[in-house]
Every structure is written in structure tokens, then in C-alpha cells.
Amino acid sequence: MARRGQQPPPQQQQAPPTQKNQAGKFNPAEFVKPGLTEEEVLEIKEAFDLFDTDGTQSIDPKELKAAMTSLGFEAKNQTIYQMISDLDTDGSGQIDFAEFLKLMTARISERDSKADIQKVFNLFDSERAGVITLKDLRKVAKELGETMDDSELQEMIDRADSDGDAQVTFEDFYNIMTKKTFA
């Protein structure tokens, strides 16, 4: 309490509500978008805070490398500096939470997409040999009730097979599945 004739202590200013709401708490709802839940935003914020070791509400290249590595992503120096260059909209040389969220959302969706494609590949690779063969395609076509002759199935393999060994590796399969147009 202020004594008579004394001014009360000045109120501390709060950070603008870009990452915190009026009560000073982080509001994940501000960052939710299609394909990203509040829970995922909070998990990414926890990672951001964990690696914002100096508490500046931004992550520098050294902190970003540690964050990406801990989340299971490859983090070469050249990649890190390229990420910062691509995402650093304010030219600070660092990434704030909104920029970090954009990066992680892209990486998560890339990782999830690859995992989903791996599951589909495994459905075709019935012998778990790490490749899809004519025999595998024949079996899947039969299970799906498709009537395709071996020449049609072989043509499918030939289109996807990058090294001409008459087998489709996961890499071949992934490339076909993520291709925007088919020749």
C-alpha cells in the first residue's frame, strides 16, 4: 500500500497478446488451424519453450538445431540456416513461436504422410521383403477383385521401378505416391 503522498508502484506492462492472452497466459486456440489440434499446438509450444533456453521468445540457430534433433528430425547446419532463412519473416535471424509452429506443422505433416505411405506399402509387400513384386501386385489385385493380366501389372511395376530390377522399393513407391502428376 502506498502511504499518503507516495505514488503506488507502476504497473508492469504485459507482452502484446500475440502469444499470450490478456491474462498473460499462452492461448493455443489462437494457433489452431485445420489439421492441427490445440493439444498439438501445446506440445509444439512446450518444445519451443524447452529450446528457447535464453527465454527471449525466439529460437536462434543453435536452439533450433537442438529442437529439431530432439523431435526426431535430421538437423544439419545447412538445413537449419536454410529453415531460418525461409521462415524468419522479420529478418531477426531467429524464429519466434508463430514461425516455429509453421515449420513444425510442415514437418509433422511430412512425417505423417510418409508413415501413412509406409503403411500402404506394407499392405502390398506381403512377404515383408522390402519390395513390391509382380507376385505381390497379383495378390492385391485378386484380393480387391480386380481382373488385370500380368502385362498390366508389370507395366505398373515398370512405371514405379527406378532401377529396372522389376521390383518397387519403398523409395520408388513413395516417389510415385507423392508425385503431383503421372506421366
From Swiss-Prot:
Instruction: List the InterPro entries hit by this protein, alphabetically.
Output: CALM/Myosin/TropC-like, EF-hand-dom_pair, EF_Hand_1_Ca_BS, EF_hand_dom
Domain of life of the native organism: Eukaryota
Location of region: Disordered = 1-30
The alphabetical list of record keywords is: Calcium, Cytoplasm, Cytoskeleton, Metal-binding, Repeat
Enumerate the spans annotated as EF-hand domain.
Answer: 39-74, 75-110, 112-147, 148-183
Leader peptide range in chain numbering: none
Query: Where is Ca(2+) 2 bound in this sequence?
Result: 88, 90, 92, 94, 99
**Binding sites annotated in the UniProt record for Ca(2+) 1:** 52, 54, 56, 58, 63
Q: Pfam families annotated for this entry?
A: EF-hand_7
Q: Does the entry annotate any disulfide bonds, and if so which pairs?
A: none
Example GO molecular function? calcium ion binding
- GO cellular component terms attached to this protein's record: cytoplasm; cytoskeleton
Question: Does the record carry Cytoplasm as a key word?
Answer: yes
Cell compartment(s), UniProt: Cytoplasm, Cytoskeleton
Function recorded in the entry: Plays a fundamental role in microtubule organizing center structure and function. Component of the infraciliary lattice (ICL) and the ciliary basal bodies.
Task: Describe, as the record does, how this protein assembles with itself and its partners.
Answer: Monomer.
Family (UniProt): Belongs to the centrin family.
Provide the protein name. Caltractin ICL1c
